[in-house]
Amino acid sequence: MPNAIVAAEQYREIFLNQHPIMDVRAPIEFTRGAFPNSTNLPLMLDSEREKVGTCYKQSGQQAAIALGHSLVNGPIKQQRIEAWASYVKANPNAYLYCFRGGLRSQLTQQWLKEACVEVPYIQGGYKALRQYLIGVIEAAPTQQPLLSLSGMTGCGKTDFLLQRKEAVDLEGIANHRGSSFGKNIDPQPTQINFENQLAIALLQHQTSDAACLLLEDESFLIGRSALPQTFYNAMQAANVLVLEESDDARLERLRNEYVHKMYSGFCERLGAEAGFAAFSDYLLQSLVSIRKRLGGKQHQELQDLMQQALDQQINQNDTSLHLVWINLLLHKYYDPMYLYQLEKKSERVLFKGSHQAMHEWLDSYQTR
């Protein structure tokens, strides 16, 4: 059989090879934070875990263990063993863990062994793996030169990053496009899951032959996902590349992202009528979120233009009026804010250019 315990030296390999992991923590623990390659098959359900925890506080470890055995017994125990065995059969290279790699891991492994199923458990459990990934994030800015990709809203930074092996897509990991209108249809990950996925992406990046780590110039918050402080501080000190694009191209890109993609996504999810209502709410509420910064008069003007565009879209299947409010939003809000921020980091700008020019500059950076 394989080694019964997976040691800390193998943590990196677990994530790089996306080993399937059977997570036997309670569902509430899994929901708070987990790894992309893990599946929750709990030893105890939330209610059972709560009872055992109360017993432990009141009567000690042995009484809590005895209660746990009485709660997970007979048909319930057999059902859980069968679920674990099915998972291991489908994933023969799987590992298992609980929170600390303690009693729950050992008991699960023992019960499976009695059912003639062998599966190693991970030393230190979820907690140790999580600490390992936090260390990966903190160390990443010291592993390679860090470059920050900046550019006006709508210039196509994400499109550009997705074409580069040097890049890690922070907005993709956060499932948010970073701007006031950056919310997607599916929810953002929990903060813990955002950090876990960021660390794994950084690990994968380190296996490439990229000469630098290229990241989009982000705020501390991407939607509600907060960048780890040490990592964010390093980004703030990084040299900057500025991606340039024409105003017309920016407008078309933003109409496609804010209007066409979001409308199609909502309709696909909810149907035509409910989808349009949800899409309209997304646009109007995104505008409300920056009302204080716009000022009441500017917000009202944009809201009126947005409503006219929505009316034209639903009545005439024409999205051209959306270009009017997007253009005003760019020139009255996004562009002045961007230029102010860029001025503060002007001394760190290494290069400015179009998509093609930026590709050529980075290609030459690889060979320096």
Swiss-Prot record:
Active site: C98 (s-selanylcysteine intermediate)
Gene3D superfamilies (alphabetical): Rhodanese-like domain
Molecular function terms from GO: transferase activity, transferring alkyl or aryl (other than methyl) groups; tRNA 2-selenouridine synthase activity
Domain of life: Bacteria
SUPFAM superfamilies per the UniProt record, alphabetical: Rhodanese/Cell cycle control phosphatase
Subunit field text: Monomer.
The name this protein goes by in its record: tRNA 2-selenouridine synthase
Organism in which the protein naturally occurs: Shewanella baltica (strain OS223)
Record gene name: selU
